[in-house]
Amino acid sequence: MNYFISENAFEFNSGTEFSQAARTSMYNSFDNLALFVTRNYAPVFHRTIKTLGLNDHQVLNMYDFFQEATQVIRVKQNLRESVTIPKKRYVIESPNPDQSLILNEGRTVAKVNVMPATVALMGNVEYLDRFDHIVARDEWDYRGFKSSTAYFHPNGEVSLQKFYTPAGKVVLEITHMNVKGHLMPTMYKLINYCGANYRFNTENELFTFFMNEQLKQNPGTIILERASMLNTMPGIKSTKGKYFYLHSSHTNLKGQLLTTLVELMRGELGFTGIIVATKQQQQDMQPLTMLPVLAAPDTIVKENKTNSLANCKSHKILVLGRIAKEKQPQDALHILKSVQASVADATLEFRGYSTDRQLLNELDLLIDQLGLKNTVTFGNYVVGKMLDDVIEGAQVLLSTVPTEGSGMQNIEAMSHGLPVIAYNVNYGPNTYMPNEQLVPIGNYDQAANRIVSLFQDDKQWREASRLASQQAQLFTKDSVYKQWQDLNLQ
């Protein structure tokens, strides 16, 4: 068995989760068993994995494991049909599609919040005291059973959370205590697990125990995808290899080793080796550690398509991926401004998500300052066929990321025959893109000139599109799987 491990599957997944999921699917398609393993509690986990192209048999979540809920057939729980709400005693009112109120003799005793992206299905139920304070909250699993109950102090902070099997048996409790003035989880208690109770101080300790239990049943190779979980690994007694896949550069912009990797690189965490996306990074990292550093792609493209100018929105630039300060999205705005000096109707679309409201406000201000208000748009985060349509509707992909591990968004665009203009950074574009499409970091004019050339010369665009599609062949499933098998992982 191959265990590809990270924190969660999110509503807005990053390249790490997409890479992990694509590799899971790839391995299984070659009858090489693999699981997408996650640590975090997520009642909608079995819905979000679908956006990653996975099914219930390809995933393993820690909480599912202890809740005896790894394979549960979904039964939709409509709040008006749920047997947990006695209709003879309570009245249900629905002031809006996202919430219903449970009333007893005219007083609201509970609020039922509909599960996001569903119609009237149980999401969570908040129980209220006579002062409208939340005293408890039930979380419902996407598959239709009550998964946990959290109990609250009068100040709104959680005191205790209980987790259930689909049959309603309590199997896990998390106690929250005051630590330096803040209520925090301080004890994870497994109840009657294999006939005994177990206590852990942290979620990571519980995860280590979980993996050891899983490995007793199905020994295998571990590949960890997230540095935030490095300290879960030393206690895992894997009978085979333990590897860390680094999806980014190992250094910051000043060339200094990331502090999160210091113990790993010293060999203090019990890993068998480190895997990176490019041979260039492999060569740079190997002198820094006694661990073997291996190289295999973190990107897999489903199929190659030859794009057509007829499909593109003329002079449209696309920026794809998470919108974050370290990705320098403001550079794309300056480049657009330079492009418009020669191609007045050029437009720019950001496609991705951001959790940084301050950054978005700063970008809005810069858009106004540069006079780009009518030519820049921010599109919704999309996946699958909708993402394909977005890529095929652009004429150029622009990447202003100053540091890369691979550059998944570039490779995905290239597989659709979309030309890419990117900063010439290590461990990404300069390993699979021609020099004429690479520009120095921060050189707005040179990037703009390359884009203008593609916009104004159809023959040049078609040739760039052909080369992009051709180069993306390096990342097809068959090619990538062979490179992974050549690693000879333990």
Q: What do the predicted segments below correspond to?
A:
Residues 308-327, 336:
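Conserved donor-binding/catalytic core segment of Leloir-type glycosyltransferases
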Residues 434-445, 452-459:
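Conserved acidic donor-binding segment of nucleotide-sugar-dependent glycosyltransferases
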Residues 347-361:
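Glycosyltransferase donor-sugar binding loop
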Residues 360-381:
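Nucleotide-activated donor-binding/catalytic signature segment of Leloir-type glycosyltransferases, i.e.
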Residues 402:
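Aromatic "clamp/platform" in nucleotide-sugar-dependent glycosyltransferases that forms part
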Residues 474-490:
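C-terminal alpha-helical cap of glycosyltransferases
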Residues 419-422:
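Short hydrophobic beta-strand element within catalytic cores of glycosyltransferases
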Residues 460-474:
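A short, well-ordered alpha-helix in the C-terminal region of glycosyltransferases
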